[in-house]
């Protein structure tokens, strides 16, 4: 039995979102073809995700100096504990599905905050004499990303930073088996938006069977 962590980063309702609609189609098909697997849904806009702030840096610093967790301030304890909880949840999964829109050539800021909680030295990667080494080997990920324009090819290709950044981070922590479903062109070709979504849904369903 595999554990799937389904991560969404979109404040919209599912029926209003291209990425969430495609993501839901993927998830329901996955459940049908992998009924024994455990699926955990994490919606970052409905979840407490601490930002890396002064309390977090202060708490980490005290722990590195040998202070007990109980000696941290209340805010430091709460934020550090929550970050550890999110990181542990991520580490326990075998497969990951990220569902995001493209905002200003990248993804929503709440996802960046979440990514900061899963990139922890000693947990998801470690430093060695040869450089950093990712510790999450043998796992796989899928990124479903909605883009209003066309970014897979053409002059705007180099302006797509969300999928490329996510792939870089996942590779850094050891996850190199990553696929992407790009739902793109809905704003550039509004008359074709529904057809674009349906094509992406069919691709997502097909991928769910073998993911």
Curated annotation (Swiss-Prot):
<dbReference type="Pfam" id="PF02525">
    <property type="entry name" value="Flavodoxin_2"/>
</dbReference>
<feature type="binding site">
    <location>
        <begin position="102"/>
        <end position="105"/>
    </location>
    <ligand>
        <name>FMN</name>
    </ligand>
</feature>
<dbReference type="GO" id="GO:0016655">
    <property type="term" value="F:oxidoreductase activity, acting on NAD(P)H, quinone or similar compound as acceptor"/>
</dbReference>
<dbReference type="InterPro" id="IPR023048">
    <property type="entry name" value="NADH:quinone_OxRdtase_FMN_depd"/>
</dbReference>
<dbReference type="InterPro" id="IPR050104">
    <property type="entry name" value="FMN-dep_NADH:Q_OxRdtase_AzoR1"/>
</dbReference>
<keyword id="KW-0560">Oxidoreductase</keyword>
<dbReference type="GO" id="GO:0010181">
    <property type="term" value="F:FMN binding"/>
</dbReference>
<keyword id="KW-0285">Flavoprotein</keyword>
<protein>
    <recommendedName>
        <fullName>FMN-dependent NADH:quinone oxidoreductase</fullName>
        <ecNumber>1.6.5.-</ecNumber>
        <ecNumber>1.7.1.17</ecNumber>
    </recommendedName>
</protein>
<comment type="subunit">
    <text>Homodimer.</text>
</comment>
<dbReference type="InterPro" id="IPR003680">
    <property type="entry name" value="Flavodoxin_fold"/>
</dbReference>
<dbReference type="InterPro" id="IPR029039">
    <property type="entry name" value="Flavoprotein-like_sf"/>
</dbReference>
<feature type="binding site">
    <location>
        <begin position="17"/>
        <end position="19"/>
    </location>
    <ligand>
        <name>FMN</name>
    </ligand>
</feature>
<comment type="function">
    <text>Quinone reductase that provides resistance to thiol-specific stress caused by electrophilic quinones.</text>
</comment>
<keyword id="KW-0288">FMN</keyword>
<comment type="similarity">
    <text>Belongs to the azoreductase type 1 family.</text>
</comment>
<comment type="function">
    <text>Also exhibits azoreductase activity. Catalyzes the reductive cleavage of the azo bond in aromatic azo compounds to the corresponding amines.</text>
</comment>
<keyword id="KW-0520">NAD</keyword>
<dbReference type="GO" id="GO:0016652">
    <property type="term" value="F:oxidoreductase activity, acting on NAD(P)H as acceptor"/>
</dbReference>
<dbReference type="GO" id="GO:0009055">
    <property type="term" value="F:electron transfer activity"/>
</dbReference>
């Amino acid at each position: 039995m595999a554990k799937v962590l389904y991560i969404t980063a979109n404040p919209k309702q599912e029926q209003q979102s291209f990425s969430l609609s495609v993501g839901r189609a993927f998830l329901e098909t996955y459940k049908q073809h992998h009924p024994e697997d455990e699926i955990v849904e994490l919606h970052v806009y409905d979840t407490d995700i601490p930002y890396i702030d002064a309390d977090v840096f202060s708490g980490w610093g005290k722990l590195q100096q040998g202070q007990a967790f109980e000696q941290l301030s209340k805010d430091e304890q709460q934020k550090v504990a929550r970050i550890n909880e999110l990181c542990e949840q991520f580490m326990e999964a075998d497969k990951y599905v990220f569902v995001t829109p493209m905002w200003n050539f990248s993804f929503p800021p709440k996802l960046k905050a979440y990514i900061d909680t899963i990139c922890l030295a000693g947990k998801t990667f470690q430093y060695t004499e040869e450089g950093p080494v990712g510790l999450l080997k043998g796992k796989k990920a899928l990124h479903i990303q909605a883009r209003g324009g066309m970014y897979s090819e053409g002059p705007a290709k180099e302006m797509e930073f969300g999928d490329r950044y996510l792939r870089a981070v996942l590779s850094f922590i050891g996850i190199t088996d990553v696929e992407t479903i790009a739902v793109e062109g809905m704003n550039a070709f509004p008359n074709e938006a529904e057809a674009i979504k349906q094509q992406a849904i069919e691709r997502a369903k097909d991928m769910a069977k073998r993911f």
